[in-house]
Amino acid sequence: MSQKRKVAIIGSGNIGTDLMIKILRNAKHLEMAAMVGIDQASDGLARAARMGVATTADGVDGLTRLPVFQDIDFVFDATSAGAHVKNDAFLRQHKASLRMIDLTPAAIGPYCVPVVNLEQHLQAINVNMVTCGGQATIPMVAAVSRVAKVHYAEIVASIASKSAGPGTRANIDEFTETTSKAIEVIGGATKGKAIIIMNPAEPPLMMRDTVYVLSETADQKQIAASIEEMAASVQAYVPGYRLKQQVQFEQVHNLTLPGQGTFTGLKTSVFLEVEGAAHYLPAYAGNLDIMTSAALATAERMAQAMGPLA
């Protein structure tokens, strides 16, 4: 008998399909059992069927009717924020113990960025993977936070237009709200702000992220070392994650922060690039790769903590 925990993915679009391929190829503690969509003609459902995975085009209702549903322990939701709230409520009526890994900005469970706070949420029945921008940048804010108090952090996530499917586009407001909040809750900033840019350039550009952190004055070498150490930790599950250039520091004086008064201290600027593993979409779609990689790392660690199947 397999000792792997069975999983289902809701959402057969870009993120769901990439995640499915990662689970099939790389998962040590998880087994891909079902792919759920609402469009019978979607490439994701067709690909899942070709790979021997049970499929349904009838949404979560169809999932509960699949014979394999009774054996499923984890459900990844790669739909949209509004849909996730309904999906979670519906599935819990059928199986209350399901572990939901939420890849939308719904955030009905605690935020989870694996390198920063996964160990605190191993027992949670619903965790939220924040956003692609959050997964890339919050570790950098947290890296500064563990050295100096962070008063303000602002991130700019630039992604290729081609990598943004309808779900991403429908959730732009939720992206900025959820990422901003998570910068504060997980990153440790007193105030967080997030901006997303969809770049229509051809050929498509790789995901780029810029992180600006205003903190109390501290040892710059210590902050740089903390950032480099954190980047290496992220690379353990997102190999294409890297610092694009050296961390930059600037002493600032009497800078006005809206709602916070004036600030004097250290400005740290971090420049990141995220290259995708190209499991389903091209390498420029690092924004999708970091989400699916973080979700997989989270569920793998949870499954490991649950111990062997009875």
From Swiss-Prot:
CDD domains: ALDH_C (cd23933). InterPro entries: Acetaldehyde_dehydrogenase (IPR003361), Acetylaldehyde_DH_C (IPR015426), NAD(P)-bd_dom_sf (IPR036291), Semialdehyde_DH_NAD-bd (IPR000534). Pfam families: AcetDehyd-dimer, Semialdhyde_dh. It is an enzyme of class 1 (oxidoreductase). Keywords: Aromatic hydrocarbons catabolism, NAD, Oxidoreductase. GO terms for molecular function: acetaldehyde dehydrogenase (acetylating) activity; NAD binding. Gene3D superfamilies: Dihydrodipicolinate Reductase, domain 2, NAD(P)-binding Rossmann-like Domain. NAD(+) binds at S12, G13, N14, I15, S163, A164, G165, P166, G167, T168, R169, A170, N171, N287. It catalyses: acetaldehyde + NAD(+) + CoA = acetyl-CoA + NADH + H(+). Its EC number is 1.2.1.10. SMART domains: Semialdhyde_dh (SM00859). The active site is at C132. It comes from the Bacteria. One of its GO terms (biological process) is catabolic process. Coiled coil: none annotated. Belongs to the acetaldehyde dehydrogenase family. HAMAP family: Ac_ald_DH_ac. This is Acetaldehyde dehydrogenase 1. It comes from Pseudomonas putida (strain W619).
